[in-house]
Amino acid sequence: MKKFLPLLVLLMLMPLFAAAEDAVQYDAILSRDTYLVEEPGGRSIIQLPDREQVEVLSLGEEWSRIVYDREVGYCKTGYLYHFVSRDPFSYPVPDRQRVTGFASFNVATDIKGGKFNGLTAQPGQVFCVMPGEEEYYRVPIWRDAAQVHQAEVTYYPFADWQSADSGDVIGGFTTFYGEQQGKGKAAEREHNIVLGCERIHETVIRPDGYFSFNKLCAPYSQNNGYRYAPNISQTGFGYGGGVCQLTTTLYNAVLTLPLQVDEWAMHRYTGIQYAPQFFDAAVGSYSDFIFKNTLPYAIRILATPQNGILTVLILRE
């Protein structure tokens, strides 16, 4: 009997190994009609409808192994978007912006990128950056990036969340806004951004606690202090227009850390101009942005509007 014990143990553990291998890494949405296939380039199993949600078991450069309607197979990775990680510690969201720290301007600096008309940043204004070439930092701006010379700023790398001390900045993100988004109501749009920042600024989320944007900022109405400004809707205007830029900035800041996104909606497939496609976050009567603090300590949110530079930083409390 003893000689069969290792075999019995192995047989008992096999389902656990299979379960681990088949663990869902992400939820995602299909961007088009396609087919679930047995293996990359292989025979079709079932049709996959456009805009349906699937579970991603493994994410590959060209093909991903997924589950749809209890069927397991493969589809092209390029047909998937709206990724929500089931385990942000092990599976960060693909194609997120890899910002590594924040900086403050030492001198007045002209900055522009993509279709953004640009602005003159003032000394002391804070923004998040990515590594650049040689003596430059890269600043994500409107689906593009600007180059800022290191001599013009003071740089502070994000602290590693695992070894951070109280007060350390561990994540963040920046987006840019201006007159060209206003449709004649740029001041009203900026008012809404500033009001939203005031309502989430200094919010502390305890370990295993949840942050709900709507809990702090909704309803988006005149009675709640918001002004009529451009938004993404059938009419193109609404009370609270511009607040979603704050939500988007916060969402991308959250993605710099292993925090669990619980509820998140995009405006539309094409996205919005001030953030990369598939990385905007809409809020309203029927949508919220909610995440869970999965870190072993409390975190604090700092939301700072700076005359066209909107920066959200996340600190260890």
Which residues does each PLM region occupy?
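SH3-family beta-barrel domains
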Residues: 19-35, 47-50, 57-60, 81-115, ...
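Solvent-exposed, conformationally flexible loop/turn segments
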Residues: 51, 124, 205-211
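Short alpha-helix capping/helix-loop boundary micro-motifs
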Residues: 38-43, 112-115, 197-198
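A mature extracytoplasmic/lumenal domain signature
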Residues: 40, 60, 68-70, 79-81, ...
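Sec-dependent N-terminal signal peptides of Gram-positive bacterial secreted proteins and lipoproteins
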Residues: 3-20
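SH3/SH3-like beta-barrel superfamily modules
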Residues: 46-78, 117-157
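Polybasic, low-complexity association/targeting segments
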Residues: 160-206
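Exported/periplasmic cell-wall-interacting domains
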Residues: 210, 217-317
